UniProtKB/Swiss-Prot annotation:
Its cofactor is Zn(2+). Belongs to the class-II aminoacyl-tRNA synthetase family. It comes from the Bacteria. GO terms for molecular function: alanine-tRNA ligase activity; aminoacyl-tRNA deacylase activity; ATP binding; tRNA binding; zinc ion binding. Its EC number is 6.1.1.7. This is Alanine--tRNA ligase. The gene is alaS. Zn(2+) binds at residues 559, 563, 660, 664.
Length: 869
């Protein structure tokens, strides 16, 4: 019974018992921020059990995709080395929300296992909580399981109700006994029954757990009955499949067998028992499903777990000799195995492939160098990988710690994890020191707020009222020291609303402080962060504060155009467009906004047209300060979720009116040219546009013009005539391709006539297996049709090799398909050249990657046909 049939039978069985089939929920839990990944079937029903949600059904069943690779539930290091550890697995489950209870749950479990799946009753045994007499009696008196095969499990975890057979959602709240069903693999397998000293052996394998939530536990450990007891059951699909398919390891079941073969194909590994293939097969399931559910590789949270799994798989491929991206190629094989059960996997196949390929390409850039360093560190008599080396591998080469630990474990060594943690903390401390001026809470300032004059002036006479070195107030800053300066008055704009802080200088005679950034210490106190480049600066000094004017002007252009672009986006795409984030600096504007589809090229052109039209109007910019109620009456655009004070600044730029405290151009014409550089998606329902203005935009256009002139020169035409000239050249190329195709057809036809004489008679069937030189797939197919017509009763295989890739076509005449199927024939050859294929009984196609096996494969065709004729 294959995995698809197991899923189908499970769901249909419980549907027949009045259960509603519920689709698998995403691997990212939508109702539990404390849980990194969905790790059991009950996760999507947690709110129902807690009484916080009510469903239109009281009985449910599902096949849930689960992941255990992070936090408390982490099987990553064991995956590939044991028979039953996985990162990704499927959980079959059924639930009762105050409906049926123990009797029905246990009886249905028994009925499904013994009557539907056909497991021998004598191979099954059960466990119950030591005080659960009700469950014991159901098993022994109603189901008929012999008492010696129902094992009572006591409090084996150090307290009352602390047992393998007593389930608790948390320290308090819903809880209850559970009854587990085990399968006995027989005395030839080492291990004892549950509850015995040898229970960790492989003889007795848990396949199903029935949890009965019937109590509410108080803080003092006492329990009282729940008003509506519930049932939560779970059975691992992979474990059940191993039993039903008569194999001992989960990695031998149908889905894994196919993926392991695919991993062997992509890594050119013939030994399919290699543990690295198991790792790769497991990890393609986990990573592909994670991408489908929106988890992209990153350096934090769920994204980092995803990155760790991908890179572990890549490292195992590297261990098998792979030096180029291979892992992403397994997505198509996974879709073949699981796409029907999980339609989202099938629908997102290309996106999943692209994400995995990009991560592979990134890691392969540093993998070889990192492995050299790791190998060198483990050479000789070393028993432990130094923590500093493990951290260097992590920080410089992208090696997650568990990847380095994986390599060490294979060699019987260990990693100095404490040393790694110390090195990590050292770097974080250095980062905090280098970026201390960004950490507002590290500076305590109790003086008066400063006056900001930067809307009107770029220079200001001021007095130093505060100095900070390493987060502590000091009377002076000496030359070479990095610190923070607070002035009573400042023209420097402090980072806010997406606009970066100003840079410039604070100076007096013989004294200069270079301002590298400006950040708020408090709402009305600006901290000027930088380095004392000359002399000593002292509290009370009279200074000149001067903003870098060119940098400020470039930033203002980009900030002002962001407002105009926001208005244009709403006009072109719709009023649903809403700002989700922005970054405005001297080089560009980056604007994130709510929109559920890519912005088309035509829409971008329209947005550019509208923005540049506003710029050409050269209208005045107007800023007004008013109370929030008055601002609302003006119709100014306000951002949902943004917190505004009682007094706000309303900014009119062109036809745009928004609340904004940033610095802006005086007239729209000051922006100059506006050009969109890129458009992309950054999250579900969020798009990002990056754009440039002024001299940057002009330079970009001039660079494009230079490329056009260069291309025109290559095509020996003028820039204005480049498009028709390219169309002409493409037409000529297509004509030449058709001519080449015709010549190939003639050549193949000639070869086909010559091949007729090579056909051999095998039990009345003309058998021909040959290579057509220089042929493509279309030529092979055309030649096949002609040969079938001429040979009449025949089984034919034609092959061609192009760029090391093998193309195969098998054809069988109608009077022979009862004995020989084209699909079987082409697969016989394809398997020997590293490929696979399929098709109809009379015509099938395949491809392969190992041309060296082709001669032998073709030589064996006649004998293969003879065995079936």
């Amino acid at each position: 019974m294959n995995s698809s049939e197991i899923r189908e039978k499970f769901l249909k069985f419980f549907e027949s018992k009045g259960h509603t089939i519920v689709a698998s929920s995403p691997l990212v839990p939508g109702n539990d921020p404390t849980l990194m990944f969905t790790n059991s079937g009950m996760v999507q029903f947690k709110d129902v059990f807690l009484g916080e949600d009510k469903r239109p059904y009281t009985r449910a069943t599902s096949v849930q995709a689960c992941l255990r690779a992070g936090g408390k539930h982490n099987d990553l290091e064991n995956v590939g080395y044991t028979a039953r550890h996985h990162t990704f697995f499927e959980m079959l489950g059924n639930w009762s929300f105050g409906d049926y209870f123990k009797r029905d749950a246990l009886k249905w479990s028994w009925e499904l296992l013994t009557q539907v799946y056909g497991l021998p009753a004598e191979k099954l045994l059960a466990t119950v909580y030591i005080e659960d007499d009700e469950a014991f009696d159901i098993w022994t008196k109603e189901i008929g399981l012999p008492p010696e095969r129902v094992i009572r499990i006591g409090d084996n975890k150090g307290g009352r109700y602390k047992s393998d057979n007593f389930w608790m959602m948390a320290d308090t709240g819903p809880c209850g006994p559970c009854s587990e069903i085990f399968y006995d693999h027989g005395p030839h397998i080492a291990g004892g029954p549950p509850g015995s000293p040898d229970e960790d052996g492989d003889r007795f394998i848990e396949i199903w757990n029935n949890v009965f939530m019937q109590f509410d536990m108080a803080e003092d450990g006492s329990v009282k009955p729940l008003p509506a007891p519930c049932v939560d059951t779970g059975m691992g699909l992979e474990r059940l499949a191993a039993i039903l398919q008569h194999v001992h390891s989960n990695y031998e079941i149908d889905t894994f067998e196919a993926l392991i073969k695919a991993a062997g194909r992509e890594t050119n590994t013939k030994d399919l028992s290699n543990n690295s293939l198991k790792v790769i097969a497991d990890h393609i399931r986990a990573t592909a499903f994670l991408v489908a559910d929106g988890v992209i590789p990153s350096n934090e949270g769920r994204g980092y777990v995803q990155r760790r799994i991908i890179r572990r798989a890549i490292r195992h491929g590297y261990k098998l000799g792979q030096k180029k991206p291979f892992f992403h190629k397994l997505v198509k094989d996974l879709v073949e195995q699981m796409g029907e059960a999980y339609p989202k996997l099938k629908a997102d196949a290309q996106r999943i492939t692209d994400v995995l390929k990009a991560e592979e390409e990134r890691f392969f850039e540093t993998l070889a160098n990192g492995m050299e360093i790791l190998d060198a560190a483990l050479a000789g008599d070393a028993k432990v990988l130094p923590g500093e080396v493990a951290f260097k591998l992590h920080d410089t080469f992208g090696f997650p710690l568990d990847l380095s630990a994986d390599v060490c474990r294979e060699r019987g060594l260990s990693v100095d994890e404490a040393g790694f943690a110390a090195a990590m903390e050292k770097q974080k401390a250095a980062g905090r020191a280098a970026g201390k001026f960004k950490m507002e809470r590290a500076v305590e300032y109790t003086g008066a707020g400063n006056t900001f004059t930067g809307y009107e002036h770029l220079e200001e006479q001021a007095t130093v009222v505060g100095l900070y070195f390493e987060g502590t107030a000091v009377p002076s800053l000496k030359e070479g020291q990095a610190g923070i300066v607070v002035l009573d008055t400042t023209p420097f704009y402090s980072e806010s609303g997406g606009q970066v802080g100003d840079q410039g200088f604070i100076s007096a005679e013989g004294v200069q402080f270079g301002v590298e950034d400006t950040q708020k210490i408090k709402a009305d106190v600006y901290g000027h962060h930088g380095v004392q480049t000359q002399g000593t600066l002292t509290v009370g000094d009279k200074v000149k504060a001067a903003v870098d004017g060119a940098r400020r002007a470039a930033t203002m252009r980009n900030h002002s155009v962001t407002h105009i672009m926001h208005k244009a986006l709403r006009e072109v795409l719709g009023d649903h467009v809403q700002q989700k984030g922005s970054l405005v600096d001297p080089d560009k504007t980056r604007f994130d906004f709510a929109h559920n589809a890519p912005v088309t090229r035509e829409q971008i052109l329209e947005i550019e047209k509208r923005v540049n039209a506003e710029i050409l109007l050269n209208s005045d910019t107007q800023a007004r300060v008013m109370d929030i109620e008055s601002a609302q009456k003006t119709g100014a655009l306000m951002l949902f979720g943004e917190k505004y004070g009682e007094t706000v600044r309303v900014l009119d730029i062109g036809s745009s009116r928004e609340l904004c405290g940033g610095t802006h151009v005086s007239r729209t014409g000051d922006i100059g040219l506006f050009k969109v550089m890129s458009e992309s998606g950054v999250a579900a329902g969020v798009r990002r546009i990056e754009a440039i203005t002024g001299a940057k935009a002009l330079g970009y256009v001039q660079d494009l013009e230079a490329v056009i002139h260069s291309a025109a020169a290559m095509m020996k035409t003028q820039p204005a005539e480049l498009e028709p000239r390219l169309a002409q050249v493409l037409d000529q190329m297509k004509a030449l391709e058709r001519e080449v195709g015709a010549l190939k057809g003639k050549l193949a036809s000639s070869q086909g006539d010559e091949l007729l004489a090579q056909a051999v008679d095998v039990k009345g069937i003309k058998v021909l297996a040959a290579v057509l030189e220089g042929a493509d797939v279309a030529t092979l197919r055309n030649t096949m049709d002609k040969l079938k017509d001429k040979l009449k009763t025949a089984a034919i295989v034609l092959a061609a090799v192009n760029d090391g890739k093998v193309s195969l076509i098998a054809g069988v005449t109608a009077d022979s398909i009862a004995k020989v199927k084209a699909g079987d024939l082409v697969n016989f050859v394809a398997q020997q050249v590293g490929g696979k294929g399929g098709g109809k009984p009379d015509m099938a196609q395949a491809g392969g990657t190992d041309a060296s096996g082709l001669p032998t494969a073709l030589q064996g065709v006649a004998a293969w046909v003879g065995e079936r004729a």
